[in-house]
Amino acid sequence: MENRSISRTQLRNRNLKLVLQQIINHPATSRIAISHELNLNKSTISSLYNSLSADHFIEELGEGAASNVGGRKPIMARLNKKYGYTITFDLGYRQLHAMANYLDAEIIDYQEIDTKGRPIEAMLDDCRHFVQEMQTQVHAIHGLLGICFSIHGIINDNQIVHSPWIDMHDIDIVKQFKAEFDVPVILENEANLSAIYERDFNAGLDYRNSITLSIHRGIGAGIILDKHLFRGKQGEAGEVGRSLTLLGPNTAGQSVESICSEEAIINRVKRIKQDETTNRQTVVQLYQQHDREVERILSQSCSVIAGLIYNVVTTLNPDAIFINSELLAETPELLGDIQDNYRDIAQDQLPITLTKNTQFATSLGGCSLITHYVLGMVDYELQFKEAD
């Protein structure tokens, strides 16, 4: 009897999550539509629906249209976004990005805080202040549900293994923020979160296997295989920026990110122009003015990136490649150079596109990850709508 009782409980919990999945993935649905989609009888669906409603997961929208055969009009429903909210921090070398989201991923607040040259302790204090600010301003039934930190480094078992750009001073971020705010805290690699964004918010919905190249101060790859994030044995999957390139007579033996990361490109332009104030905007402006030296640097970088994509594709055979890069977002014509270089090497038409929202991609990926976690739905496919 005990085993049977456990089995029934497990089955009901599974079905509750399947119904919640339908409500999340279909912003205006009904009990009858869920019943048809899950192939469960109406009485079972009504019981599960009522349980979710009692737990404040559901917001009813009123009557929908009657079916072609008549009968009562269905009550339409969607996820109650104000069930609770999550917070994601992207700990960047130059800026801290802070985002709060309702349960349906709607953005409540987003802030960018200058952090260049500041120690990790000061950055984490900024994070605390943001959480405290949200706790006083955001009205949600269950308040703060969880926190995600995006780390530009290697994460294994929810701990930072390697942080090349920010000295973490051996601070246990998870332990500190769990103790202070009494919610789950997750750390994840920035490129992995960019890949989750493409899977759950963007065109990645069309692909079961995709790779997102994240090109910032370094270069990493977020890998989605059969709709699941692939981290590797010790969280080091996707550390492609350290791979060596043999493209061109002057690049042999150099790491890819030493040539075509945003930081590397800026530094190369800085040296050629002998201008220490050079930044991303400077590079974009010079390129748009058809500066020959900058065009040469960016052309070479596009060639190296294409070679990197080719190596990744031959290893993992994805359906598509996404590139998350602020520099490329401001010079989108360079995408054509990358595509042409890749097709010259590979002789195929693999889709290679830019992330459509470089500003929010990582933070929204973090929102999705922590939302999956706090709902106990890590292995469920959830689709979120991004505001226009």
UniProtKB/Swiss-Prot annotation:
It comes from the Bacteria. The keyword Translocase does not apply. PROSITE patterns: ROK (PS01125). Signal peptide: none annotated. Gene3D superfamilies: 3.30.420.40, Winged helix-like DNA-binding domain superfamily/Winged helix DNA-binding domain. GO terms for biological process: D-xylose metabolic process. InterPro entries: ATPase_NBD, ROK, ROK_cs, WH-like_DNA-bd_sf, WH_DNA-bd_sf. Pfam families: ROK. Residues 31-50 bind DNA. GO terms for molecular function: DNA binding. Keywords: Carbohydrate metabolism, DNA-binding, Repressor, Transcription, Transcription regulation, Xylose metabolism. Belongs to the ROK (NagC/XylR) family. Transcriptional repressor of xylose-utilizing enzymes. This is Xylose repressor.
